[in-house]
Amino acid sequence: MISTLLIIDAMNLVRRIYAVQQKQHGDTPTALIATQSTTTNALKKLLRIHQPTHAICVFDSHAPSWRHQIYPEYKQGRKPIPELLKQGLPAIQEQFFDLGIDSLVTEEDEADDLIACLADKIAKQQQKCIIVSTDKGFYQLLNESIQLYDYFQNSFVIRQQVHQKMGISIQQLNDYWAITGISSSAIKGVEGIGSKGALSLLQQYGSLNNIFQQAEDSNNKLLTKIKSQQSNAILAKQLVTLKTDIKLGFNLKDLRYTDSTD
């Protein structure tokens, strides 16, 4: 029997729900209470839809990560989590636990890396994993075993659709972001080359390494920019690539889900 692990990108879900309540109620206890209730109902719905054998909610610790250590500008300019919501997270985690779902958070690792590590381990065991998030960074993980589900659109992100939309393969995504950067995370990439230029280079040469090789002896304007900012591209790729080698300290059996409402 194939197991199905449901991984909730908890802050991705909670912050979007809180943003809706915040518009209606401001940063008030009413907004927090509504968020707690709505988030719990969302989790119930996800469990009902996907019928997982295993499940976990992964939270960010909000502490500086290894990405901040090698690139201090990482995520500069992002709005911090509202203090009221931050104070309410333990109660949300407790509600998740009451539904039979544990929460995972560590001081050393970002939630995205923890999620990637969990998903990778499941895929290597030929089991099924469903990540619930709107974060495009998880596109790089998509394969036969790992799926991405957008709760707010009530739909899966399909690999073929990503390919058609982006114009490149899943395997080329990190090379693409290494060139274009990711503005929402303040990752610069190669200045002067946007989406169109990055696509052109990857469609022609296939990979970032091949682009570097071609740039060595070329007068092409795009390749010249790549050559002069090669270190930026290498750093950007390191930043956008999710880690899958974190020692978690637990096994899949520890995440088994049993419906506590029965």
Curated annotation (Swiss-Prot):
One of its GO terms (biological process) is DNA replication, Okazaki fragment processing. Its EC number is 3.1.-.-. The gene is xni. Belongs to the Xni family. Its cofactor is Mg(2+); K(+). It comes from Psychromonas ingrahamii (strain DSM 17664 / CCUG 51855 / 37). Binds 2 Mg(2+) per subunit. Only one magnesium ion has a direct interaction with the protein, the other interactions are indirect. Binds 1 K(+) per subunit. The potassium ion strongly increases the affinity for DNA. Mg(2+) binds at D112. InterPro entries: 5-3_exonucl_a-hlix_arch_N (IPR020046), 5-3_exonuclease (IPR002421), 5-3_exonuclease_C_sf (IPR036279), DNA_polI_H3TH (IPR020045), FEN (IPR038969), HhH2 (IPR008918), PIN-like_dom_sf (IPR029060), Xni (IPR022895). Residues 171-258 form the 5'-3' exonuclease domain. This is Flap endonuclease Xni. Residues 192-197 are annotated as: Interaction with DNA. Keywords: DNA-binding, Endonuclease, Hydrolase, Magnesium, Metal-binding, Nuclease, Potassium.
